[in-house]
Amino acid sequence: MISSNDFRTGTTIEIDGAVWRVVEFLHVKPGKGSAFVRTKLKNAKTGNVVEKTFRAGETVPQAVLEKSTLQYTYKDGDDFVFMDMETYEEGRLTAATIGDRVKYLKEGMEANVITWNGQVIEVELPNSVVLEVIETDPGVKGDTATGGTKPAKVETGAQVMVPLFISVGERIKIDTRNDSYLGRE
């Protein structure tokens, strides 16, 4: 159990059988009446954000999350097979469980898998990955003055906007959080 007075950004709590992460919190002490804590909570499974108010000192169950590092080994049909690097056990996750950053998964890549009561809540991929460009339009000389971009397909199949000077076969660094080009590797 955790008191509402101890809420901090990132604290995980359990409400109605679901895990919620505190995104924002504000302790309010009105001139008349008792103090309360106004929060914005994000559902760890669905990503929905709701506002909820707690009385000051109210206790709620704290969700205990387990974090383990798994290595992506291969894709089997619609499932992605991960191996626990400590126990060498294999586990399967679907693309829906991994989220929209699944397009950056490359064999041998490590990911942090967060579980609660045996359920996978979230899969955290690295913030940046280095991938090879396998398909893009050739850069035309003189096009770089405007600082334009062009689409490029990388080895995992993801589509990324890259500067005009990038060509097929180059290795580029990509930010997986916002699908942006970070630089050459």
UniProtKB/Swiss-Prot annotation:
Keywords: Cytoplasm, Elongation factor, Protein biosynthesis. InterPro entries: Elong-fact-P_C, NA-bd_OB-fold, Rib_uL2_dom2, Transl_elong_fac_P/YeiP, Transl_elong_KOW-like, Transl_elong_P/YeiP_cen, Transl_elong_P/YeiP_CS, Transl_elongation_fac_P. It is found in: Cytoplasm. Pfam families: EFP (PF01132), EFP_N (PF08207), Elong-fact-P_C (PF09285). One of its GO terms (biological process) is peptide biosynthetic process. One of its GO terms (cellular component) is cytoplasm. SMART domains: EFP, Elong-fact-P_C. CDD domains: S1_EF-P_repeat_1 (cd04470), S1_EF-P_repeat_2 (cd05794). Gene3D superfamilies: 2.30.30.30, Nucleic acid-binding proteins. SUPFAM superfamilies: Nucleic acid-binding proteins, Translation proteins SH3-like domain. Disulfide bonds: none annotated. It comes from the Bacteria. Signal peptide: none annotated. Pathway: Protein biosynthesis; polypeptide chain elongation. GO terms for molecular function: translation elongation factor activity. Belongs to the elongation factor P family. Involved in peptide bond synthesis. Stimulates efficient translation and peptide-bond synthesis on native or reconstituted 70S ribosomes in vitro. Probably functions indirectly by altering the affinity of the ribosome for aminoacyl-tRNA, thus increasing their reactivity as acceptors for peptidyl transferase. This is Elongation factor P. It comes from Synechococcus elongatus (strain ATCC 33912 / PCC 7942 / FACHB-805) (Anacystis nidulans R2).
